[in-house]
Design a protein with these regions (language model features):
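Hydrophobic, aromatic-enriched alpha-helical segments typical of multi-pass transmembrane helices
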Residues: 2-240
Length: 240
C-alpha cells in the first residue's frame, strides 16, 4: 500500500511537471522557426540556403519540439496511470499506444536535429555526397504533408487520437479539470478521424492538411492545462 501511494505521488508529480514543461516549450516554439519562411511554398534552393544560414536556430527549434513531445507523453502516461485504477486493461493499452506515438515522433525529430542540417551543409558546400543529399533533403521536407518526414509526424498524431479515444470516457470524473480534459480528448480523437476520412475522400487539399490537422491538436494544449490543475490538486491532497 505504501509503495502504491508513493508511486501515485511520483506519477502525479511527473504529470504536473511535464504539463508545465509543455506550456513552456509551447511559448518558446512561438519564437523559433521550424522551417524556412514560406514553409510549404518555399522553394528547395531557398530552404537549403535558409537551413545553412540558420543551422543553430533550426536545431534549437526541433530540440524544443523533442522536449515538448516527451513532456506531453509524460502527461499522457500519467493520464493512463490514472484511468488504470478502475480500468487496468484500458490503461495498459493506452500506455502502449502512447509509447508507440513516442517512437513515431522521435524518428523524424531526431532526423531534424541530426540529418537535415548535415544534408543542407553538404548541398551548400558541394562536397562528396551532395548528389545524394539533395534528393534526401527533398524527401525529408518538414512542411510538405506527403514527405517521408511529415508522414511519421502525422502517424504520431493519429496514435495520439487513438489514445484520446481510449482514455476520454474513463477519465471523466467529478472534478472540472477531468471533465474538460475528457471532453477535449474525445473531441480531438473524433475530429482527427473525421479529418482523416475527409483526406482519404479527397476533400482536403495538400496545402490545407497542416492547418486542418495541427489545428485540431490545439485541443491537446487544453487537456495539458486542465490536467496540470488536476495533478497539482492530487499532489496537494496527498500532502494532507
Amino acid at each position: 500500500m505504501v509503495i502504491s501511494i508513493s508511486l501515485d505521488q511520483q506519477i502525479n508529480r511527473l504529470g504536473f511537471l511535464s504539463a508545465i514543461v509543455v506550456i513552456v516549450t509551447a511559448v518558446i516554439s512561438a519564437f523559433i522557426p521550424l522551417d524556412a519562411p514560406g514553409g510549404y511554398n518555399s522553394e528547395h534552393a531557398d530552404r537549403v540556403a535558409w537551413l545553412s544560414a540558420n543551422r543553430e536556430t533550426f536545431i534549437a527549434g526541433w530540440v524544443n519540439q523533442i522536449v515538448a513531445m516527451l513532456s506531453l507523453s509524460g502527461v499522457f502516461f500519467a493520464i493512463a496511470w490514472r484511468i488504470a485504477a478502475n480500468n487496468p486493461l484500458r490503461g495498459i493499452l493506452a500506455a502502449m499506444v502512447m509509447l508507440m506515438s513516442v517512437m513515431a515522433f522521435i524518428i523524424p525529430k531526431f532526423i531534424a536535429v541530426w540529418t537535415i542540417p548535415l544534408l543542407a551543409d553538404t548541398i551548400s558546400s558541394g562536397v562528396v555526397g551532395s548528389d545524394l543529399a539533395d534528393p534526401l533533403l527533398r524527401i525529408l521536407n518538414v512542411s510538405i504533408p506527403f514527405s517521408l518526414y511529415t508522414s511519421f509526424d502525422y502517424l504520431g498524431f493519429w496514435l495520439y487520437s487513438v489514445f484520446a479515444l481510449m482514455v476520454a470516457v474513463p477519465l471523466y470524473g467529478p472534478a472540472l479539470a477531468t471533465k474538460i480534459s475528457s471532453v477535449s480528448l474525445g473531441l480531438f480523437g473524433i475530429i482527427y478521424h473525421v479529418l482523416l476520412l475527409a483526406l482519404w475522400a479527397g476533400e482536403i487539399a495538400s496545402a490545407d492538411i497542416e492547418s486542418s490537422f495541427l489545428g485540431a491538436s490545439l485541443l491537446l494544449l487544453v487537456v495539458n492545462i486542465a490536467m496540470a490543475f488536476q495533478f497539482k490538486g492530487a499532489m496537494d491532497s496527498e500532502k494532507k
